[in-house]
Amino acid sequence: MPLPLPSRSSKPETKKSRSSKIVPSGNNGQSEKRGENYQEKISSSSPRRLCKKRSAFEDLTNASQSQPAQLKKEANKEFVKDVPKKIKGNTPALGLAKSNEVNMVSYKLESSPGVVSTTLVPNITEKPLILERSTTSGTITTEEASFFRKPLILKEESTTEDTGLIKRSLFLKKFTNKGEISLMEKPTSVQEEADSNDEFVVKLITFGKKHKTEEVAITKGTLSLKKMCTYQEDLALQDITVEENSFFMEPTNFRKKPKTDDVTPTKKMLSLKKKKYITLGKVSRMKKPLVLQKTNSEDESPLIKEPLAFKKKPTKKETTFTLRPLSLKKYTTQGKMAHLKKPLESQNTSGEKALIKEPLSFKKKPITKEESLFQEFSASQEKHTTDREVVLLKKPQVLQEEKDSKDKFLMEPMFLRKKCTTKETNPTKKPLPIKKKCTIQGKMYYLKKPLVLQKTTPGEESFVKEPLSFKKNTTELSMLQEKYTTQEEVSVLKKALTLQKTLTEEESHLKEPLAFKKKHTTEEATPTKKLSSLKRKRFTAQGKRSCLMKPLVLQTSSGEKTHIKEPLSFKKRSAIEESFFKESPVLQEKHTMQGEVALLEKPGALQENVSSEDEFLMEPISFRKTHTTNEVVSTKEPLSLKKKKCTTQITMSICQELLDLQNIISKDKASFFMEPVSLREKSLAEEVILTKTPLSLKKKEITQGKIFLLKKPLVSEKTTSEEESLFKKLLPFNKKSTTEGEFLFQDPSVLQEKHTTPQEVSLSTKPLTLPEKTTTEEEPYIKEPLTLEERPTTKEEFLSQEPFSLHAKPTNEDESLFWKALGLQKTQTKEDSLKKLLTLQEKNTTDEESLLNKPSILKEELSTKVATSIEKELSLKKKPTAQGEVFLLKKQLALQENITNEESLIKQPLAFLKPSIEEAILRESLALQEKPRSEEETLFKEPLSFQEKPTLNEAFHFKEIISLNEKHSTGKELSLKEPLALQENPTQKEDTSLEDSLILQVETSSRVPSTPPESRAGMSSVGKLSTTSKSSVCESSSNKPSSSWGESSQKEMTPLEDIDRNHGDPFFNSIYAKDIFSYMKEREEKFILKEYMNKQTDISSCMRAILVDWLVEVQMTFEMSHETLYLAVKLVDHYLMEVICKRDKLQLLGSTAFLIAAKFEEPCPPCVDDFLYICDDIYQRHEMLSMEISILQTLKFDINIPIAYHFLRRYARCLHASMKTLTLSRFICEMTLQEYDYVQERASKLAAGSFLLALYMMKLRYWVPALEYYSGYKTSDLHPLVKQLNILLTLRPSNKLKTVYSKYSHQVFFEATKIPPLDMLKLEEILNYC
């Protein structure tokens, strides 16, 4: 007969008063309201207990720490009492999530609440959509304004004061080299102030807007600054007064001193000191930076889109948004350094509050005049210069730099404005994204600014050359980014080296702009600066080879001492116009003859850096050419020539471009520089091709120690007179392709070279994949140097290696024969590849995406071979990485990224025209950019897997690169990349968890290329997924195409514990989670239930079902956890399997088992009287206690029985399943509790079957491979169980026991019962398909 349910109306008052302490009402605030049907059973007179209870819905929060607003809506309804107190504790987090602007402004982990609120897909998707609207609208919405204003103002100051920031950074780096961190510390304190001074940042924007009327007065102050520089700049400033001065207005008004002359440079210095100081040292704040990166990366793509829209509108916000994404990307590129954002904010805020104070103390003398400030700067720089001899140059440089920097930057916005006002919106668009890149590192503005200054003097010609200046900036950006990436990856040595690099590079950058002005002022300084920049770049390019760098530095110092003599000496060495270029080959020849491969590597590294930076310059050039239709026509040829020049050497390109500008600006002085100009025109344009090839060769040489001697003599010989003649032959071909074909022709090379830049790994996804591959591939390269040499011959090498073979002849007959063979091989392949590329390029000239697609098309053609080779090599290295060599790999990767990546990565891009590994790598990066295609994903998954094994460092690099890919991609690609970036950057706490999902995506891509629309809706929310949430909106990450799991999945998915990082539940401790669940699966074998109902004489399976239905009601009444319910049912079954139970004791057994389970699971379990009461007092206290003893003795006190609920939570967390999917699986699993037929199923298998059916019902089949991996069960093994479960759901309406059904029909449980079960025929199709 059915068990009696408690009827409280019949209870006497005495019992009511006796048990008044037990009422499960929400005295503790756990549930304010109760269902009516339960109040009938447990009236107000029911016992009141003061203990804390977890609700049935508590586990929902276990899967995801926060509940959406639906919980609030249902607060007054029947089952809200089931919502645990944890959810209520998280409601403020939800509120925070709603006010995203507050969280984003604070840049604290509070941004994660916004992420936490992603349990409901609609709510979260709305927020990201709002963010995108606001960003694209061109107006800063109230939500984003607070978040954007900080970076915007950062960049606004940087726009007006970018040069100042650059100066400061130079300053800082000089100080940091000497260890004078005292100056740095002040900025840090200022930064701390700035963290709390978010409002200040907001005020800056308002100031800038309010005081546009006052801009003229301030511009006059700036004009006074510029008077010190040139009168032309003053005129230009007057032209710009309205818009450009708005940038000045903000800092000046905030300073509350119209003397922007003095205050701004000091602020710049201080803020840059902060930058430097923070970027160098404070990696300890990794967690916050990660979150910051998440927020940044989430907003980067929309921000990038904004500048495109804003470019059309030449308002002040154009530069601000453009600058902001730059800063964001800078931080993402720097990965661990991401907390730079706060420093940057502090640079604005503190830079505007406390920086005034510090500059005043620092500048007490020169308050009235900036010259004195500049002199102080020069003096400080003299103190801290790495080279004593450089001091002579630095003083005038610093003076001119700081004079120029402000003026130059002002001038540059002038042109931007002019472009905006004039019809040249297209050119403005490109400069703006390029500015973004430049703003990523304010240091780069030196080139822009001098270029712009010189542009202003001639007039309209500046428009044509403006992209050139941007190109230079981008190259330097790449340099700087390389520095930062190397600093992140490399240990203390790298930091020191990078400091040196940054010092030298900054000096070189300073000197280059100084060279601009010195060219205007004095003619002698320019050649020395060029040389110094060349040598410094050598110095910087060598990076980790500090020992080798020193001799180069000595050369630079000597070069700086003898301003004119040094270039003359170079010319003497080369005896040809190619003197600058040949200097490195001459040195190489010397070193090669000596066999000092290390010294040879230096020039190689120099050229590599040169090529990497210059090549990066080349990319913006190509982009601008494609977009700036008006200007490009005039500039395409010189740009292409300059691209080639840049690829040869940055110094060459800089000198050449400077000479061009000089020729345009000062024709009087042109005579002095005419020789370098001619050099450029003749040898550089021609030699560039060779220089690229020697670079590739040198890169090869560095990886291949023995071949250095061969290649380097070849390089030196290449630089000889034969190069010119051969190049002249090649020049017409190159010139033909320059307008259209060569842009794209170089664009692939640009792409290649981008990726070749080892330090620019942050800028290109390819380098990250490549560095890892290069580590894997270095071995085969070293093993097969000759084959590699033959491979990496890109088109450029094809052009150059024919002359190579010709050049090689004079060196050695053997080498000449060797190179001839190589040349023949390469020429055969090169012609085909060149034709293909040219055709592809000509077709896709207008689109930036075409530039990416071209290599992708080529790669697709050549991918099969490459894929196999990559897989083999990756497999080779996957083994050692998994074996604990991850540290070694990371170190090697860092080193290789600076050294071998510069070399081998350049190799690979060069080789990527041929069917080489780079093609697959580019394909992989493109796969990320374009959304992984089934073909590209197959190749891409392997680099992902490789990255996953090194886990943290490589994961960071990978994610940074993904975010940086957005920089290189157009707005369309950004729209595609945003979900990826959102997923990958914010999950840096869950580094490998996302990578796991990515691997799932990649490997499962072949069958289902497209994602369901519902999954796309949640994409943005996935980007905000909090690591603390037990389950996140996993439909959002359903951009993962589905297919076979793949053989390598087992290897790739090793770092499971990262999924559990920062998880509050002890079951999901990141260190122990994997071991815990593997142990639970082992324990399952000890608790396998057998059929016991046959030997039970007095009870049946129907009575058991009634008991379980009643236990579900008890669990809801006492608001206890689901774990308690599942464990109680397990205890009952195990007891019944051992002991024959009477019918009248069955309810006692159930209540006692629930008591034991509550003691085991609940923090505040109900007391015995509570259970006696719910049993309607039909049992006595001693009976329950004796039953408790009996159960424990029967089970031998081993009651830690694995339950299906734990496994459900685990699967949901591993798959990042949404709450709706998880709740559906819980409903299915809880339905099985009543059914005796499922008693024999293992808990883990039952959970896997329930979750699999839920995935099928939610149309999320592409997660099935992931479930297979994490559960350990094959879908084929689960299919019979899935069919049974689907039948159970289909027949549930006819079931008389409705408690579970009614429980999950509530909105708190997402109305899981309303989701229809699958049709049996459809299920059969699904199962057969799988």
UniProtKB/Swiss-Prot annotation:
Q: Which GO terms describe its molecular function?
A: cyclin-dependent protein serine/threonine kinase regulator activity
Q: Which GO terms describe its cellular component?
A: cyclin-dependent protein kinase holoenzyme complex; cytoplasm; nucleus
Task: Note the SMART domains from the entry.
Answer: CYCLIN, Cyclin_C
Q: Which organism is it from?
A: Canis lupus familiaris (Dog)
**Which residues does the annotated region (Disordered) include?**
1-50, 1002-1059
Question: Polar residues bias: where?
Answer: 20-30
Give the residues annotated as coiled coil.
none
Gene Ontology process terms (BP): cell division; G1/S transition of mitotic cell cycle; meiotic cell cycle
SUPFAM superfamilies reported for this sequence:
Cyclin-like (SSF47954)
User: Does the entry feature the keyword Glycoprotein, yes or no?
Assistant: no
Q: What is this protein called?
A: G2/mitotic-specific cyclin-B3
> Self-association or partners: how does it assemble?
Interacts with CDK2 kinase.
UniProt-listed PANTHER family: CYCLINS (PTHR10177)
Q: Which InterPro entries does this UniProt record tie to the protein? A: Cyclin, Cyclin-like_dom, Cyclin-like_sf, Cyclin_C-dom, Cyclin_N, Cyclins_cyclin-box
| Keyword Cell cycle on entry | yes
The UniProt function text for this chain reads:
Cyclins are positive regulatory subunits of the cyclin-dependent kinases (CDKs), and thereby play an essential role in the control of the cell cycle, notably via their destruction during cell division. Its tissue specificity suggest that it may be required during early meiotic prophase I.
| Localisation per UniProt entry | Nucleus
